Amino acid sequence: MSEFDFKSSNFFDFTKKEKHFEYLNRQYFSSEFYFGTGASHASAANFFNKRSLITNSICYSLPRIYLKGDFVTFKKIFCLKEKKVLSLEEIFNRVSLATKLHTHSISEKSESIILIDNDEDEILDAARDFLNFSEQKDENELLHKYHQMRKDYILKNKFFSNKDTVDFHEFFINCEGSVPKNFLKTYLFQNELLKEISNKIGFELKKKYLI
């Protein structure tokens, strides 16, 4: 891992230490939750039974969240051909694209897309929903719709149905997890706000890349 210049009383870099795995496991064990990306180390949070808040995920169907108390936000996908940000509904309807994203075999150039990171407001909003989460609260109707889209996509996708066991398939289908309410309001379906965001991003990309 390359070094980076960051100093804080709450930040400790143990990556160069001899017992870095031991330090990592201790940290997972003593932490209240995991906050980071959906890279492989996010799986350790599940092993230690810790809640997870994952940002900038591109695994729209299975973003390493398994319980209702786990939260995820996704990268935005700007389609260069259509000059817009794709809604989650549109991503799931494009089975090939969603599968390439899930398997991390995506090529932005060949797919004519640009992946855009979550901005500060999206991450802050996700953290707020994550910290205020309660099992007793009424569930979000949009979250139900997201999970139904995800399940429908998995059921019609050969990548999942060709797995060796029924248990494996059922595990993916029945995974639960939460997506921030405001994120779903903005990105689950095409709407006027998403059109405004698309126009703004398209304008910035045009200045930067002359698309």
Where are these regions (language model features)?
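Residue-level detector of flexible, active-site-proximal loop/helix-junction positions
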Residues: 18, 59, 78
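Conserved beta-strand scaffold positions in the cores of enzyme catalytic domains, especially
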Residues: 11-13, 52, 71-72, 113
